[in-house]
Amino acid sequence: MCATPVSPTPLPATAPLALRWRGTEPYEASFEAMRAFTDGRTAETPDEIWLVEHPPVFTLGQAGDPAHLLAADSGIPLVKVDRGGQITYHGPGQVVAYLLLDLRRRKLMVRELVTRIEQAVIDTLAAYNLAGERKAGAPGIYVAPGPAAGSHAGAKIAALGLKIRNGCSYHGVSLNVNMDLRPFLAINPCGYAGLETVDMATLGVTAGWNDVARTFAACLTANLDGSPAAVAQPQAGALTA
């Protein structure tokens, strides 16, 4: 947890973010790791962004309704977690960013954090000539009407869910890059029946996971603290093609 500092010199609010590339990792491993990271925090612990890609998995938020899983025999595991929100899907071709932040140190309210995360998604999409927009009361980012949207205006392209514990955040945001979208048909995405889910590839973007992940990381960092991330070099094989 975010404990009382041992030393009288905690990190300043402007301490740089550290970026961790975790590669392809089972969801449960990421979930356990971010909880452990948050539980072990002190006032001196630097904030981090983790970028990861998961094998197929459905996750259900702490107040989620299992009835939103429409096909229990899909063969895809369901993991109940402690974030906000309903049910969503993670799978190959999706960039997931986990945001491990000390909100008190950053003097951030939860609503402002959500707004900054959403803006980072919008900025990332704009880098590939796509337009994203918010919807009131429905966290996440949706495809805005326009030439690039085609028939997919209003479709959800990024999902967001957070947990705040002792003033620190974990969980985060997922951006659909180039996925098999069929598993989304087995759920009511984020609890909305009939909501279309789309990815960047469907909208004509040819960039791969690595390229989009780097752009997304830069946009998240810029929106969170306005400075470049302290980037940990990925290990061999840590980034997917």
From Swiss-Prot:
It catalyses: octanoyl-[ACP] + L-lysyl-[protein] = N(6)-octanoyl-L-lysyl-[protein] + holo-[ACP] + H(+). GO terms for cellular component: cytoplasm. The record marks 156 as: Lowers pKa of active site Cys. One of its GO terms (biological process) is protein modification process. It comes from the Bacteria. Residues 43-228 form the BPL/LPL catalytic domain. Keywords: Acyltransferase, Cytoplasm, Transferase. Substrate binds at residues 83-90, 159-161, 172-174. Pathway: Protein modification; protein lipoylation via endogenous pathway; protein N(6)-(lipoyl)lysine from octanoyl-[acyl-carrier-protein]: step 1/2. One of its GO terms (molecular function) is lipoyl(octanoyl) transferase activity. Disulfide bonds: none annotated. InterPro entries: aa-tRNA-synth_II/BPL/LPL, BPL_LPL_catalytic, Octanoyltransferase, Octanoyltransferase_CS. Its EC number is 2.3.1.181. Catalyzes the transfer of endogenously produced octanoic acid from octanoyl-acyl-carrier-protein onto the lipoyl domains of lipoate-dependent enzymes. Lipoyl-ACP can also act as a substrate although octanoyl-ACP is likely to be the physiological substrate. Belongs to the LipB family. In the reaction, the free carboxyl group of octanoic acid is attached via an amide linkage to the epsilon-amino group of a specific lysine residue of lipoyl domains of lipoate-dependent enzymes. This is Octanoyltransferase.
